[in-house]
A protein has these predicted regions:
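Short cysteine-rich clusters marking metal-coordination/redox-active sites
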Residues: 7-11, 30-33
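Cys/His-rich microdomains that often coordinate metals
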Residues: 14-15, 34-37, 200
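Cysteine-rich micro-motifs
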Residues: 23-37
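Accessory beta->alpha helical hairpin/"wing" motif in late/C-terminal subdomains of nucleic-acid enzymes
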Residues: 39, 185-216
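Short amphipathic alpha-helical interface segments
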Residues: 43-162
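Short amphipathic alpha-helical interaction segments
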Residues: 160-180
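Conserved BB-loop
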Residues: 244-270
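Conserved beta-strand-loop-alpha-helix hinge of the TIR/SEFIR fold
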Residues: 273-283
């Protein structure tokens, strides 16, 4: 059964929800959070910190793009299930999709640990949202809150924070971007924040902002990523899991090449990953 409803992570209205092939799972497709699945087969989805999950999906989510169908989606099902299902997909044994496991440990490792890290990530993301230098940027409210790492929920009981406080958090971050000269334009929200047609901006990145982006890209902002190339199949699942755990315990983030959509070819996305990682592991 398909339906349109509100995204449980970011609050975007009118998103796609699907409950069909697995009665214990719910699949969502949101323009802000991308494609993701909650599974009730374990308690992983209950352990997710939504204050970290919303930015994670906004920055790292899988979305269909013009001229390209995205098969990947995040899932709270076990790593073993996701890996096995992906093997079947690649071997044409199912016609569905390619699940990529996510849990709170993965999200927490990704989440920025300092204010300056957040600022750098925001600037890089704003640049990714543009097609050309100097393009003006408008963000709907769910996108703004996720982009600015706004805490939507109180820590003790998951009660939602009032709209007034959400706006205050978001504008604090954007005001700093204006103050240090990284962006210019209109630093305000247009319309009632509770309305679906309200939006932030328009803003654009300044020459100083682009200079900072160049510095970050040269510094290699993916330095915590380890790209892993290995034989992929059910017989390597235990080894794969051991490699993932070892990389995580060392404080890094494992990216397996099969989790990067490439269809057997060196695509721009895959080539970009190879260029930007500090460590490439071949097994």
């Amino acid at each position: 059964m398909n339906a349109m409803e509100q995204c449980p992570v970011c609050g975007k209205r009118g998103i796609f929800k699907q409950v069909c092939y697995d009665p214990t799972a719910v699949f969502y497709e949101c323009p802000v959070c991308g494609r993701y699945e909650y599974s009730m087969e374990n308690n992983a989805y209950e352990e997710l910190d939504y204050n970290e999950l919303a930015p994670f999906l906004f920055y790292e989510g899988f979305r269909n793009q013009q001229g390209r169908v995205e098969h990947r989606y995040y899932s709270t099902k076990s790593r073993e299930w996701c890996d096995t299902y992906t093997v079947e997909f690649r071997n044409d044994k199912n016609i569905a999709e390619m699940p990529v496991h996510m849990d709170q440990k993965i999200i927490s490792l990704w989440f920025p640990k300092s204010f300056s890290q957040k600022v750098d990530m925001i600037l890089i993301k704003l640049n990714e949202l543009t097609e050309f230098v100097g393009q003006e940027i408008k963000l709907d409210i769910p996108s703004l809150l996720s982009c600015m790492f706004v805490r939507r929920f109180k820590l003790d009981n998951r009660e939602t924070v009032e709209d007034k406080e959400l706006v205050k958090q978001a504008l604090y971050m954007t005001s700093y971007l204006f103050e240090i000269g990284y962006v210019k334009g209109i630093n305000c929200i247009n319309g009632d924040v509770s309305r679906a047609d309200s939006y932030y901006g328009e803003i654009s990145i300044t020459p100083k902002g682009y200079d900072r982006i160049d510095q970050l890209q040269q510094r290699d902002n993916d330095g915590k990523d380890v790209l892993v190339a290995m034989r992929f199949g059910s017989e390597t699942l235990k080894l794969r899991e051991a490699i993932r755990e070892g990389i995580f315990e060392a404080g890094y983030h494992a990216i397996f090449i099969d989790e990067v959509e490439h269809n057997g070819f060196i695509t721009p996305e895959l080539l970009s990953r190879i260029k930007r990682v500090d460590l490439l592991l071949l097994t």
